[in-house]
A protein has these predicted regions:
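Short, glycine-/small- and polar/acidic-enriched structural segments
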Residues: 1-24
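Pocket-lining segment of extracytoplasmic ligand-binding domains
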Residues: 34-144
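Extracytoplasmic/secreted envelope proteins and their assembly/folding machinery
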Residues: 13, 27, 50, 76-79, ...
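Flexible hinge/capping segments at coil-to-helix
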Residues: 18-39
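An extracytoplasmic/periplasmic, membrane-proximal ligand-sensing/linker region
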Residues: 108, 139-198
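Short, flexible turn/loop "capping" segments at secondary-structure junctions
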Residues: 8, 27-29, 127-131
């Protein structure tokens, strides 16, 4: 299973942000700047930007375009480090659904807004990746088919049976869950293989 956004999409985006007062307004403005990534193990905070940003930068590898790169220690910390000026810009994630000024409908920016630790008017969006498949909700393969069916039915019913619980689990506004298989994640698998070999 995977989550379905309020608009019916089943993905999210890597989003590059900078301070509103930085003067930067587009991704090419990061030339010669300090770029922060969320975490080396993050799909949206590192993997996808590393693989897809060169297209937006005229074919240049990120490391050859910016002055330096570093890691923020997670998505929330990365955004805080951008606000502090440790990085001129940084990559995090959001649903891309709704308005940037609200932190979108879900994702790190929305969670930070909901916690009261981020005012979106302090940031500007410089870049948004291609759609990234939402993460999976998986069941071990050696569990009986009957148990798998019960677990699947429970999660598919959760948005209507206990909307507050569903929202707390997923961290934002989602429509529900949908069935997917490993082929849905092929772009991520291929991107990971391209960066580590295999």
């Amino acid at each position: 299973l995977t989550t379905v956004q309020t608009d019916g999409s089943m993905g999210y985006y890597s989003i590059m942000v900078a301070r509103k007062d930085s003067g930067m307004t587009k991704v090419t403005d990061i030339k010669g700047k300090k770029l922060g990534f969320a975490d080396p193990d993050s799909t949206s905070g590192y993997l996808i930007p590393t693989v897809t940003l060169p297209d937006a930068l005229g074919g240049k590898p990120v490391k050859d375009y910016v002055a330096s790169t570093g890691f923020g220690g997670g998505h929330e910390n990365l955004v805080l480090e951008v606000l502090k000026g440790t990085f001129d810009a940084g990559t995090t994630f959001g649903s891309g659904v709704g308005n940037f000024k609200d932190g979108y409908t879900s994702g790190n920016l929305r969670k930070m807004v909901d916690k009261g630790i981020l005012n979106m008017s302090d940031l500007v969006e410089l870049w948004k990746s291609p759609l990234i498949p939402n993460g999976p909700l998986v069941i071990r393969s050696n569990i009986s088919d009957a148990t798998k069916a019960k677990i699947t039915a429970f999660f598919k019913a959760l948005p209507t049976k206990d909307a507050a619980c569903f929202s707390a689990i997923e961290g934002g506004e989602y429509k529900g869950y949908a069935d997917v298989n490993v082929n849905f994640y092929k772009p991520i698998i291929d991107a990971r293989k391209a960066t580590i070999g295999g």
